[in-house]
Amino acid sequence: MSVTPIEELPSLGDALEDAKRAASYRAVDENLDPAKHRVVGIGSGSTVVYVAERIGKYQASPELKAKVEFICIPTGFQSRQLILDNGLRLGSIEQYPEVDIAFDGADEVDPELNLIKGGGACLFQEKLVSTSSAQFIVVADSRKRSPQRLGTSWTRGVPVEVVPSAYVRVLRDLHGIPGCRSAQLRLGEPGKAGPVVTDNNNLLIDADFGPLEDPAALHARIKALVGVVETGIFAGNAAKAYFGSADGSTQTLAR
């Protein structure tokens, strides 16, 4: 397909953006197959901007334009806008509950491909789309790759999406889980007075458990609390992760 190879692209003039673009473009180039991928999940965050951009370039290429139309499923307001801005067809998870492939970013990735997500407050919809996908691909710059356990590089805690009326109880219950160092409601300051509100009109709590010995077990423990909608621990469903560097190179982690 007639898209410019990554190696031939000029620098964006920002090393971090070059890294994000490299990871995203490489992930799309190596995994998106128009012959079998029609429904595509588009995640949230600053790195996924380049995923939508690359898929948009493929969709606009003469080889694909008249033959295949990707249907892109957003994980929130931002990704919905990315889909539209790149000339892609917008779908919904209600219309297409089975997603062929999904691309999303991460706040931290451990050596076992477990993730912490939710720094951008879209974690429930991100998990809905990623777990509905036959193949889930993670894109990030190299800072997000942790050589050790989750919670080593990302030190802001595990994001927990909660029903607004339950946040006080959930805060109390989180403090009762062994290993919880702190738990606090995420505030929107300085841009917004009051708490951060998710696209689902829920609130977010950030719960610090330090480095996580068993991410799946902690997710299950938190998810069982009354009032919890979802956690930002993504354990076991990512197939591959791409990490971009400032020089345009990428590293890959796969199951």
UniProtKB/Swiss-Prot annotation:
GO terms for cellular component: cytoplasm. It comes from the Eukaryota. Pfam families: Rib_5-P_isom_A. It is an enzyme of class 5 (isomerase). The keyword Nucleotide-binding does not apply. Its main location: cytoplasm. Its EC number is 5.3.1.6. It catalyses: aldehydo-D-ribose 5-phosphate = D-ribulose 5-phosphate. It is found in: Cytoplasm. GO terms for biological process: D-ribose metabolic process; pentose-phosphate shunt, non-oxidative branch; pyridoxine biosynthetic process. InterPro entries: NagB/RpiA_transferase-like (IPR037171), Ribose5P_isomerase_type_A (IPR004788). The keyword Isomerase applies. NCBIfam families: rpiA. Belongs to the ribose 5-phosphate isomerase family. This is Ribose-5-phosphate isomerase. The lineage of its organism: Eukaryota, Fungi, Dikarya, Ascomycota, Saccharomycotina. The gene is RKI1.
